């Protein structure tokens, strides 16, 4: 089974604490690493995770609050000291490129690799990354400044050929690609062999949605409907609902409601306010509405399993 893992580097919010690093994650899909947000200390957590720096080529920044991007310059500089040669792509709002370019020119001149900014409009849902096995799409969110989440979607792979049936019907090799892609096969006598006799369905494609930071926003449900794993911020308990609304954040109960209505398979909550020394109240409030809820914590790794159709 191909890897599809989410590694939690940090799960705190804006105020640094001794318990949590700022929210940051790495998604490992088939040994390609994708970082989501890069708060202060993210590179130290990346080292602890034992993930290979050389496989991290894409970083996605949800918005321009410091707890989501203050770690970028340090990480970029470290890559340079390690002699990196592969291009690093930073997917972000255009403002971040304008902010970081002078710093790169000052601190990172003459590095052995290129940093390329690929900008997007956070208010628009669009595919911003596409390869042969994966797409990454923005999820417009509502925060105090322009913000988006990210939807990671595997592409459906072709069905698996049944070698025994191919041999039985003496089907030539040049027909196999058509059959893998869903075609039936016509025998020399005109009889049609249906595709489902010649193939075994491949596993269903997996999806992961990352939604932080945002006010309670039901209109994201259509875009994230049915995902295998949803990370949703749960900055506050329900007793702080007014504060959550004022600061454009979400309560744990509201995160649970989003997960339940969107019929996701599993909910992971994070971006915890520093006021909570024990986040069990947040887990309880989310679980009361959506039982299959996990509490994010540093070093947590979640594997999204393949599901047979």
Swiss-Prot record:
Its EC number is 3.1.26.11. Keywords: Endonuclease, Hydrolase, Metal-binding, Nuclease, tRNA processing, Zinc. Zn(2+) 2 binds at residues 67-68, 213, 271. Zn(2+) 1 binds at residues 63, 65, 143, 213. InterPro entries: Metallo-B-lactamas, RibonucZ/Hydroxyglut_hydro, RNase_Z/BN. It comes from the Bacteria. Pfam families: Lactamase_B_2. The active site is at 67 (proton acceptor). HAMAP family: RNase_Z_BN. Homodimer. Zinc phosphodiesterase, which displays some tRNA 3'-processing endonuclease activity. Probably involved in tRNA maturation, by removing a 3'-trailer from precursor tRNA. This is Ribonuclease Z. The gene is rnz.
């Amino acid at each position: 089974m191909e890897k599809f893992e989410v590694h939690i580097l940090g799960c705190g919010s804006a105020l640094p604490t001794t318990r949590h690093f700022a929210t940051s994650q790495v998604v490992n899909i088939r040994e390609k690493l994708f970082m989501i947000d890069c708060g202060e200390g993210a590179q130290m957590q990346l080292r602890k995770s034992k993930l290979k720096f050389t496989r991290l080529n894409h970083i996605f920044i949800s918005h321009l609050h410091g707890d989501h991007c203050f770690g970028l310059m340090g990480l970029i500089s470290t890559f340079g000291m390690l002699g990196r040669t592969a291009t690093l792509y930073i997917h972000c709002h255009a403002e971040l490129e304008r902010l970081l370019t002078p710093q790169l020119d000052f601190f990172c001149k003459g590095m052995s690799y290129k940093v390329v900014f690929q900008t997007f409009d956070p208010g628009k849902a669009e595919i911003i990354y596409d390869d042969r096995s994966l797409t990454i799409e923005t999820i417009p969110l509502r925060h105090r400044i322009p913000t988006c989440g990210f939807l990671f979607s595997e592409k459906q792979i072709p069905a698996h050929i049944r070698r025994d049936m191919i041999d039985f019907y003496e089907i030539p090799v040049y027909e196999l690609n058509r059959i893998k892609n869903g075609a039936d096969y016509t025998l020399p006598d005109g009889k049609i062999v249906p595709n489902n006799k010649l193939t075994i369905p491949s596993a269903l494609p997996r999806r992961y949605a990352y939604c932080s930071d945002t006010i309670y926003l039901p209109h994201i449900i259509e875009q994230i409907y049915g995902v295998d794993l949803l990370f949703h911020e749960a900055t506050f308990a329900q007793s702080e609902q007014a504060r959550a609304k004022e600061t454009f954040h979400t309560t744990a109960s509201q995160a649970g409601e989003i997960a339940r209505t969107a019929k996701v398979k599993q909910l992971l909550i994070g971006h915890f306010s520093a006021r909570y020394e024990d986040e069990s109240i947040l887990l309880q409030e989310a679980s009361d509405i959506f039982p299959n809820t996990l509490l994010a914590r540093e070093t947590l790794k979640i594997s999204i399993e393949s599901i047979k159709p």
